Amino acid sequence: MSRSGSLSVSQDVYIVGGADVSHPYDCSVYVVDGGEEMVLIDAGAGEGYELIVDNIRSLGLRPEKLKAVIATHSHIDHIGALCQFREEFGIQVIAHELDTEAIETGIGSGAEYYGVSYRPCKVDVILRGTEETVRCGRHDLKVIHIPGHTPGSIAVYLDAGTRILFGQDVHGPYFLKGSNTEQAKISLRRLADLDADILCEGHFGVYEPKEEVRRYIEGHLRSLY
C-alpha cells in the first residue's frame, strides 16, 4: 500500500518535497543521508525550493552536507530547482547523457506546460552506462538507466538491508515527445526484477511491502500492451 504523512521513508531515507510536501508543481524529492554527506533524488520544479530546504532542516539534517542531486530525468518538475541548490550549497548535478542536453538547455523540459521559467543548469557528472554507482557517505547508490519516459531516465536503488527503489515516474506517461513504449516495457521489467521492499515513486507516494511494489510496477507494465 502507499503511505503519506511522515517524512521518514526508512532509515536514512526521507521525502522532503512533493505536491503535498512542498509545492503542487514538485515531483517527490527524496534525500539519502549517508552520514558525512547526503544526496538528493531530484530537485522539484523550483517553486517549492525554500520549503524543501526547510524540510531537510526539520529532520535535524544539514543541507550544507548535500553532495549532489541525481536528476532522474529532464522534466521541469524534477529539475527546476537544480540551479538554486547549486548556488546555495555547491552541489553537483548528476544525470544520464541522453537527458543532459535537455537539462543544460531546457528544451523539452515542459516548463511552458507549468507556466514557469527554467534556468538551464550544467550537468557535472554525466552517466553513460547501463548501471553506475554513486557514493553517498556510508551508502552506495546504484543508478540504473531506464529509458522509456525520457531517453535518459534513471532509477536509483539502495540496498542497506531494506531494498529501496527510487523508481520515480514508474507511472509514465509514455506517450510524450521523447518517450518510447518499447523501451519502457524493458525498463519496467527490470525494475520489477529488482524485488525492492520499498518503492519511492515520483508523484504517487511510497509503496511497500515488496509484493505491493511488484504489483504497482507490473500494473503499469500491463497498461503498455
What does each model-found stretch correspond to?
Residues 26, 102-106, 175-179:
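Short, charged, surface-exposed secondary-structure boundary motifs
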Residues 12, 32, 42, 52, ...:
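Divalent metal-coordination and catalytic microenvironments
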Residues 3-59, 155-170:
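Conserved beta-strand hairpin/beta-sheet module of binuclear metal-dependent hydrolase folds
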